[in-house]
């Protein structure tokens, strides 16, 4: 093992990277409330793992979506547990995100020179809420259907562009298969991809600038 490590160390300077990670200064005023962002990240990773597991059984069609969720909950080994963890972790992720935003705002973490960190954080907050909205509809039960109908109908109040925007969100004039396909694509591909872009940016900025001092 020593020879293998030496080969990697010679080429990649692993020890220098490890020292940089472990020797980062942590201000003395930091408390448990500064862990809310990390808890949000942990919830997101749980979401990725459990969501990936559910894609093996979920069928994104209006005729089979609800039945596939029922099958997952009643027939698949530990399927009920996987979906329950996914649902609980989703609620926890939204809650921790909200508390994290409040903590950052109240401690002045959005001020110069951390404006871009704040901007990426707000984008991640919007993505988190979008995950909740799109995921809520995927079982395609009565709650999910009417939630989608209400949410996608809100932009209709916007003058001129309201109706075209509603049709863009739904994929047609009414809520149906096109809507479910759009929400499934958003939930499982587009939103995770955007999160994978902005989350490293957010953490790298925090890593570079450090934790802000007390007010």
UniProtKB/Swiss-Prot annotation:
Q: Which residues cross the membrane?
A: 32-52, 90-110, 116-136, 186-206
GO BP terms: photosynthesis; respiratory electron transport chain
Cofactor(s) in the UniProt record: heme b; heme c
Keyword set includes Hydrolase: no
Q: Note how many cofactor molecules are bound and how.
A: Binds 2 heme b groups non-covalently with two histidine residues as axial ligands.
Keyword Plastid assigned to the entry: answer is yes
**Which is an annotated GO molecular function term of this record?**
electron transporter, transferring electrons within cytochrome b6/f complex of photosystem II activity
Give a single Pfam family match: Cytochrome_B
Q: Which UniProt keywords apply?
A: Chloroplast, Electron transport, Heme, Iron, Membrane, Metal-binding, Photosynthesis, Plastid, Thylakoid, Transmembrane, Transmembrane helix, Transport
Entries under CDD domains matching the protein: Cytochrome_b_N (cd00284)
Gene3D superfamilies per the record? Cytochrome Bc1 Complex, Chain C
The residues that hold heme b 2 are 86, 187
Q: Where does heme c bind?
A: 35
GO CC term (a single one): chloroplast thylakoid membrane
Name the residues that bind heme b 1. 100, 202
Please give the family membership noted in the entry: Belongs to the cytochrome b family. PetB subfamily.
Which function does this protein serve?
Answer: Component of the cytochrome b6-f complex, which mediates electron transfer between photosystem II (PSII) and photosystem I (PSI), cyclic electron flow around PSI, and state transitions.
* NCBIfam families, sorted: PRK03735.1
HAMAP family named in the record: Cytb6_f_cytb6
This protein's assembly is summarised as: The 4 large subunits of the cytochrome b6-f complex are cytochrome b6, subunit IV (17 kDa polypeptide, PetD), cytochrome f and the Rieske protein, while the 4 small subunits are PetG, PetL, PetM and PetN. The complex functions as a dimer.
Q: What else is known?
A: Heme 1 (or BH or b566) is high-potential and absorbs at about 566 nm, and heme 2 (or BL or b562) is low-potential and absorbs at about 562 nm.
The name of this protein is Cytochrome b6
